[in-house]
């Protein structure tokens, strides 16, 4: 599970777990930085979670959750273990946690550098990629 920030566009929380229970989600929310609002999809487990800010529970469309869906697509693209369970799976959850920690650190460094570069050079193409941060 992941929590993302729209501005700056970074992963602010992640948990590797065998379940999606409310208590697991609550731990992730408690350790992440506070936000003014939290947008979730229609998963019922979010109803029991206490969010420090406003909670937008959107069951009808993805307009509030497209950012986290985009990050999850990136995770599935760059980490094969998350792409196809039938072909590739982690032997231990600790291994997946370690891989995810490295990815999140590199992804967030890339995102902050990309934002800085765009503020200095508006409209220019970025001369570096995510792989430069591993």
Placement of each model-derived feature along the sequence:
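Residue-level recognition of single "structural anchor" positions
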Residues: 1-134
């Amino acid at each position: 599970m992941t929590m993302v920030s729209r501005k700056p566009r970074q992963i602010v929380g992640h948990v590797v777990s065998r379940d999606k229970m409310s208590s697991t989600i609550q731990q992730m929310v408690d350790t992440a930085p506070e936000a003014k609002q939290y947008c979730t999809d229609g998963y019922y487990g979010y109803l029991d979670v206490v969010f420090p800010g406003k909670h937008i529970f959107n069951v009808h469309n993805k307009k509030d959750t497209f950012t986290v869906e985009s990050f999850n697509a990136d995770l599935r693209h760059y980490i094969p273990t998350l792409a196809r369970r039938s072909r590739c799976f982690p032997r231990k959850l600790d291994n997946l946690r370690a891989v995810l920690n490295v990815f999140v650190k590199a992804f967030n460094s890339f995102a902050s550098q990309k934002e800085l570069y765009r503020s200095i050079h508006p409209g220019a193409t970025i001369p570096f990629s995510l792989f430069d941060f591993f």
